[in-house]
Amino acid sequence: MPRSLKKGPFIDDHLLKKVDVQNEKNTKQVIKTWSRRSTIIPDFIGHTFAVHDGRKHVPVFVTESMVGHKLGEFAPTRTFKGHIKDDRKSKRR
């Protein structure tokens, strides 16, 4: 179930403060965060976030099409290694 509109989008305060400081100084440094749950707002456009995926920080450059989504959607936590090849020779034995 989606979040109620009267509550507004969830953004961690520390993340919003870091973006506001960079916007005031007109700098674009990578912002390291563990907050995968924060919603992307229009103030984030043009910034790069290093979103934690459980073992490392994945760089995510925010564009207009990402507004309204969560930061965690762009940093996958699972690595797909591919399906195991079917070995027919060993099955016959």
From Swiss-Prot:
Keywords: Ribonucleoprotein, Ribosomal protein, RNA-binding, rRNA-binding. Protein S19 forms a complex with S13 that binds strongly to the 16S ribosomal RNA. InterPro entries: Ribosomal_uS19, Ribosomal_uS19_bac-type, Ribosomal_uS19_CS, Ribosomal_uS19_SF. GO terms for molecular function: rRNA binding; structural constituent of ribosome. One of its GO terms (cellular component) is cytoplasm. Pfam families: Ribosomal_S19. HAMAP family: Ribosomal_uS19 (MF_00531). NCBIfam families: rpsS_bact (TIGR01050). This is Small ribosomal subunit protein uS19. Belongs to the universal ribosomal protein uS19 family. The gene is rpsS. It comes from the Bacteria. It comes from Mycobacteroides abscessus (strain ATCC 19977 / DSM 44196 / CCUG 20993 / CIP 104536 / JCM 13569 / NCTC 13031 / TMC 1543 / L948). One of its GO terms (biological process) is ribosomal small subunit assembly.
